[in-house]
Amino acid sequence: MIPDVSQALAWLEKHPQALKGIQRGLERETLRVNADGTLATTGHPEALGSALTHKWITTDFAEALLEFITPVDGDIEHMLTFMRDLHRYTARNMGDERMWPLSMPCYIAEGQDIELAQYGTSNTGRFKTLYREGLKNRYGALMQTISGVHYNFSLPMAFWQAKCGDISGADAKEKISAGYFRVIRNYYRFGWVIPYLFGASPAICSSFLQGKPTSLPFEKTECGMYYLPYATSLRLSDLGYTNKSQSNLGITFNDLYEYVAGLKQAIKTPSEEYAKIGIEKDGKRLQINSNVLQIENELYAPIRPKRVTRSGESPSDALLRGGIEYIEVRSLDINPFSPIGVDEQQVRFLDLFMVWCALADAPEMSSSELACTRVNWNRVILEGRKPGLTLGIGCETAQFPLLQVGKDLFRDLKRVAQTLDSINGGEAYQKVCDELVACFDNPDLTFSARILRSMIDTGIGGTGKAFAEAYRNLLREEPLEILREEDFVAEREASERRQQEMEAADTEPFAVWLEKHA
C-alpha cells in the first residue's frame, strides 16, 4: 500500500548531509482551569504581558485558552526545554489555576459564557476578537476550546539543492514549494499514523454532545463519560474541530498558484448558512463577513503550507511572494503524559515521517481523492485500535491491514532514522522507531489506549484534574533552564509597549478600518 521509496532512501543514504539543519518549532494550546476543573474566568495573567504582541505566550480562541510558542530551533532538546520554561514561568504566575492536560474540555457547558480572547483597543486587536465572535456564532464556543499541539517543520536548503540541483530565485520558490506539496499529499494519504500512535482523545464528557443525537456507537460510563472502545482522537472527528461547510471548497495541494486561488476564492464565496447569522445585531458586530471563510486562517486543515508573513500581508500573499517556507502539522492531540503536552519521542517521529513524506512519490490529488483519504483518517480516528482494521488507497476498493501498513512504513522510517542518527550521533531516532513500531502488534501501547484506561477508572474529569495538579506542582518547583525571570519581565514590558504603540498609531475608527479588511 505504501509507495516504493527504496531508490529515494538509497539516494538519502548517499547524501546524509542533506538532512543537516532541519528546523522546527512547537505551539501548544491549553485551557486555564480552576482546581475543580472548571474554566477559569479571570483575564489573561498579568505577568504574561500582552497576548496581542508577546513573542512566546498568547491566547487562542478564548481568554482562558493559552498558547505557547517556541522560536524556530535546530535542536530538539533546546526547543523542548524552552517550551518547558514557558510552562514553568506560567505555572508560577497563574495563582491557583492549572493548565488542562487534555485536548477535550470537560467542565464546560455549551450555554456557558466563554469569554473570547481580548487583545486591547487597536483595530488589529478588535479584529482578532471579532473573528473569534464569528467562530463562536458559526461553530459554537465549545468546539473552539478544544486544544492541540502544532509542529512546524522545514527541510534545510541543502536538502533541496541535493534533490533539485543548484536552485535560486524563482526557480527555488517553485521547486521547494512543489517539494512541500509532495509532503502534504503524502501526509493526507498516510498521516493517519499520527492519531493512531498519539491520539489521546478517545472519550468525551457528556456535556460535549450538547444533547444532540449522534450516530456514533458510544459506550457510556456511570459518571456520564462517552467513549468508543477503539477510538484514538475524537478531537479530529466530526465531533471535534472540523468544518463540514468547507468540504466542498475543492482546494487542492498540487500547485502553489492553484492552492492560493482556491483559498482566495473561499474568502470571497458567500455562504447562505452564515448569512442567516447576520453581520450585526443591536449594534454589535457578529462576524467579519458572511463568506465561507471570514479570513484564511478559518480553513480547517490537518496540515498547512506556511511562510512567515510581513506586516499587513495575508498568509496566501506571503506564499505567492516567496513560496512555501515550512509546514505546519496540526493533527497532534495534547500529550497527557507530558507536563508540556508534547515530548521528544513525538518530535523525532514527526521528523522521520516528514522526511519520508518528502522522499515518497506522491501523485497529484484531485479534490475527490482528497475526500477519499478522509475515509482512512476517520477509520483510525473512530476505531484505529480495532483488531483486523483495514485501510484503502485513495478511492480504490482494495483494502490492507493497518497493522501491516504500519510495519511497512516503519521499515522505511528505520532507514531514515539511521541516516539522521549518522549525522547527529547516537541512536535516538532508531530508538524511537523501535519503541513505536511495537504499537502495531500491541495497540494497548498507544496513547489512546493508555489514557482510556485511566479515564474509565476515574472519568475524564478525574483524570484531567489529577494530571493538572501533578504537573502544576512539578512545573512550579522546577528551575528555569534557558530563559531567566528577567527575560520574561522584559518581554512582558516590551509586549505591553508594542500594544500601546499599536493603539496610539490607529487613526481610523474601527468601523471604517473594518470595511477595508472585511
From Swiss-Prot:
The keyword Ligase is annotated on this UniProt entry: yes
Pathway the protein contributes to: Sulfur metabolism; glutathione biosynthesis; glutathione from L-cysteine and L-glutamate: step 1/2
Sample GO molecular function, one term: glutamate-cysteine ligase activity
InterPro entries named among the record's database cross-references: Gln_synth/guanido_kin_cat_dom (IPR014746), Glu_cys_ligase (IPR007370), Glut_cys_ligase (IPR006334)
Coiled coil spans: none
GO biological process: glutathione biosynthetic process
Signal peptide region: none
Reactions that this protein is recorded to catalyse: L-cysteine + L-glutamate + ATP = gamma-L-glutamyl-L-cysteine + ADP + phosphate + H(+)
Enzyme Commission no: 6.3.2.2
UniProt entry keywords in alphabetical sequence: ATP-binding, Glutathione biosynthesis, Ligase, Nucleotide-binding
Gene3D superfamilies: 3.30.590.20
One GO cellular component term: cytosol
Family that this chain belongs to: Belongs to the glutamate--cysteine ligase type 1 family. Type 1 subfamily.
Name of protein: Glutamate--cysteine ligase
The organism of origin for this protein: Escherichia coli O139:H28 (strain E24377A / ETEC)
